[in-house]
């Protein structure tokens, strides 16, 4: 309860500071919070904000699923096969430092300006986070569990799907949901070209027309969605770990 109260104070303080800044600055640069809220209500009433969220959500979802579908098997391969680890580990280690936005013009040249380009960009943005995260999750697995499995007659493959995958599931799920939130932060880039719907499209169109209040509104919606994903990630991970602990106690 105290934590919730402190967060409410922080939220109100941010809104108050924003309000003071808007009163002492040109609204072209710092819009009034009331105008931003009114814009949000208009888009809620006409349903445009839900259409934008739907299109953005689907783009991020497709990219995130592809990222996970590649990152998890590759992570298991790198963790369990020495040759793959020697070859791929140096590449994976530098992934987190890649300038993701630098790929945008290249992807336009390679795939054009349709949905393939947008999803490819979001795939890169999410994959460079997911791939190292999967390896970190696997490295947290207790090696004694794997050794015990091998001792009682499990094959290497059995230790993967009976020990490693269940042990890393909460952490990987947490990484996946966080990756989803990260994908939303890149929408303002990938939806600026040839997009008719989406939160990034709202930002691009509003910016071109000098409607800073709409830009702020779309950014706030993206931030709120990311916060929701972070909360879902925390709750899901907590429940999975609690279930795993109970299962271990039963065993």
Task: Enumerate the predicted regions with their spans.
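Periplasmic/extracellular loop-to-transmembrane helix junction in inner-membrane transport proteins
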Residues: 24-65
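Conserved small/polar residues in nucleotide/adenosyl-binding loops
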Residues: 238-247
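Transmembrane-helix boundary motif in ABC transporter permease subunits
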Residues: 62-92
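Short cytoplasmic-facing helical segments at TM-TM junctions of multi-pass membrane proteins
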Residues: 133-175, 199
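Transmembrane alpha-helices
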Residues: 120, 124, 156-189, 222, ...
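N-terminal signal-anchor transmembrane alpha helix
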Residues: 6-23
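Generic hydrophobic transmembrane alpha-helix motif, especially the helices
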Residues: 93-129, 136-137
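Hydrophobic alpha-helical transmembrane segments of polytopic membrane proteins
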Residues: 199-235
């Amino acid at each position: 309860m105290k934590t919730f109260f402190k967060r409410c104070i922080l939220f109100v303080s941010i809104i108050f500071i924003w309000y003071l800044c808007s009163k002492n600055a040109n609204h072209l640069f710092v819009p009034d919070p009331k105008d931003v809220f009114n814009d949000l209500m208009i888009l809620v009433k006409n349903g445009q904000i839900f259409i934008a969220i739907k299109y953005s959500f689907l783009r991020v979802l497709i990219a995130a699923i592809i990222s996970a579908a590649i990152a998890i098997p590759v992570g298991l391969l790198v963790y369990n096969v020495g040759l793959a680890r020697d070859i791929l580990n140096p590449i994976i280690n530098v992934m987190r430092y890649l300038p993701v936005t630098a790929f945008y013009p290249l992807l336009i040249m390679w795939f054009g300006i349709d949905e393939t380009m947008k999803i490819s960009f979001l795939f890169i943005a999410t994959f460079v986070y997911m791939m190292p995260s999967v390896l970190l999750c696997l490295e947290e697995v207790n090696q004694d569990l794997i050794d015990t499995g091998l001792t009682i007659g499990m094959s290497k493959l059995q230790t993967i799907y009976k020990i490693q995958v269940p042990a890393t599931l909460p952490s990987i799920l947490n990484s996946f949901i966080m990756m989803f939130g990260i994908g939303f932060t890149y929408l303002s880039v990938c939806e600026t070209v040839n997009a008719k719907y989406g939160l990034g499209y709202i930002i691009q169109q509003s910016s071109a027309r000098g409607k800073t209040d709409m830009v702020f509104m779309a950014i706030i919606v993206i931030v709120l969605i990311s916060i929701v994903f972070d909360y879902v990630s925390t709750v899901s991970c907590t429940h999975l770990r609690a279930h795993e602990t109970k299962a271990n106690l039963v065993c």
